[in-house]
């Protein structure tokens, strides 16, 4: 039997499923790898959270909300999100405002400091100044092509949904690793275990600014068989 710990991974590299208190697998290591790869490129952590709440906020601000099934099944979801259920039983999740979280936890959370221009991962990577040796047009074109491949690569590692996050076997075949040209967004040939069907709560909605998100799957035995959660 696997024991799932509530404190695992250094905060800057902690995966969404761990933050939300969900069962986890080796997919958490691929999230950490994505964080480290981007940090090596930027020179600073991509998600330098000052607390678990701030960590969740930074991830959501950059990558969007976790899938519905993660929010509905996460043991820690109510720590970070408010949930509203309408008359039709549809749920809407919103990040708790900084003031509310601070009041509930008797802490003084501070707004996130912004270290990079841009708000999305592609913007942040593309806006990093080019080096002096990239002054020639051909060098600049090559550098931007490398960045495009890098963005595609780390996007597969930093997929919030652990079912869709790339495995090591998938990631090592990416053109950024193999050196082949990237002509279109890359799709791995081998997938993780089949994604489970949508839950019965498929009519629920998840929102950051009021926009609904599609329903997601539920955890199943292939992902975390008979996992007791301690802590």
Predicted feature locations:
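Conserved activation segment of eukaryotic-like protein kinases, specifically the C-terminal portion
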Residues: 3-18
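Activation segment
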Residues: 6, 21-26, 47
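Intrinsically disordered, low-complexity regulatory tails and linkers that flank structured modules
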Residues: 179-231
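Conserved catalytic-loop aspartate of Hanks-type protein kinases
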Residues: 29
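C-terminal lobe substrate-recognition/regulatory segment of protein kinase catalytic domains
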Residues: 66-153
């Amino acid at each position: 039997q696997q024991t799932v710990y509530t404190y695992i991974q250094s905060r800057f590299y902690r995966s969404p499923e761990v933050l939300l208190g969900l069962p986890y697998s080796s997919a958490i290591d691929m999230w950490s790898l994505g964080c480290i790869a981007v940090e090596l490129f930027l020179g600073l952590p991509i998600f330098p959270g000052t607390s678990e709440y701030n960590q969740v906020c930074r991830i959501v601000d950059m990558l969007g909300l976790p899938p519905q099934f993660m929010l509905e099944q996460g043991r820690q979801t109510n720590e970070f999100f408010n949930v509203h259920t309408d008359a039709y039983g549809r749920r809407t999740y919103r990040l708790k405002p900084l003031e509310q979280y601070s009041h509930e936890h008797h802490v003084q959370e501070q707004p996130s400091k912004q270290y990079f221009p841009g708000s999305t991962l592609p913007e942040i990577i593309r806006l990093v100044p080019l080096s002096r040796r990239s002054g020639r047009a051909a060098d600049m074109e090559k550098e931007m092509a490398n960045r495009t491949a890098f963005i595609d690569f780390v996007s597969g590692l930093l997929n919030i949904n652990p079912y869709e996050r790339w495995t090591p076997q998938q990631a090592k075949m990416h053109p950024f690793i193999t050196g082949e040209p990237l002509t279109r967004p890359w799709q791995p040939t081998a997938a993780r275990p089949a994604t489970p069907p949508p839950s019965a709560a498929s009519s629920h909605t998840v929102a950051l600014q009021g926009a609904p998100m599609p329903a997601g799957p539920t955890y199943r035995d292939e992902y975390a068989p008979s996992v007791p959660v301690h802590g």
